[in-house]
């Protein structure tokens, strides 16, 4: 058994004796952080790029089906209270909506890059819509609804 350093002190009834100090060799082997391993961290942007590649490869819908369905029904309720939808119709609406949004965000990103930025801003989206001929400032059906 390896020898350890001991300190001389008077033992009292209310104090428990302390553990012996570690030897020099044991102290050298122990890491300064106490042996706790830090979790691996990727460089900023690495995970974002991985996520972009993942979603560009996939063909699945990006929006959840039930929240989208509730939104469609809520908007339709404001127009006509007794509308009913087939599930295929809501699926087609979701496909078209997601295709529109993805294309809009691509155009918005191009507008931000044109302005020598990497962060998209509302003005980029307004410019993208204006260039498409949709009109950024025009009130839409969604803009008139109190959602």
From Swiss-Prot:
Chain intervals with Low complexity compositional bias: 1-16
Name positions with the PTM N6-methyllysine. 5, 10, 19, 24, 28, 37-38, 57, 65
In this UniProt entry, the residues modified to 5-glutamyl serotonin are 6
Domain of life from the UniProt record: Eukaryota
Q: Which residues carry this modification: N6-(beta-hydroxybutyryl)lysine?
A: 5, 10, 19, 24, 28, 57
User: Which is a Gene Ontology cellular component entry for this protein?
Assistant: nucleus
Residues carrying Asymmetric dimethylarginine:
3, 18
The protein's name in its UniProt record: Histone H3.X
Instruction: Give the lineage.
Output: Eukaryota, Metazoa, Chordata, Craniata, Vertebrata
UniProt lists the gene as H3Y2
């Amino acid at each position: 058994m390896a020898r350890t350093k001991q300190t001389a002190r008077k033992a009292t009834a209310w104090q428990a004796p302390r553990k012996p100090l570690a030897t020099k060799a044991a102290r050298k082997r122990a890491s300064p952080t106490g042996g706790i391993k830090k979790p691996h961290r990727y460089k900023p942007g690495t995970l974002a790029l991985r996520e972009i590649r993942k979603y560009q490869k996939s063909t699945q819908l990006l929006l959840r089906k039930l929240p989208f369905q509730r939104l469609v029904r809520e908007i339709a309720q404001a127009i006509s209270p007794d509308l009913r939808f087939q599930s295929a119709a809501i699926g087609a609406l979701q496909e078209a909506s997601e295709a529109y949004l993805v294309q809009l965000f691509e155009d918005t990103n191009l507008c931000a890059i044109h302005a020598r930025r990497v962060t998209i801003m509302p003005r980029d989206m307004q410019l993208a819509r204006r260039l498409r001929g949709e009109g950024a400032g025009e009130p839409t059906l969604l803009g008139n609804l109190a959602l």
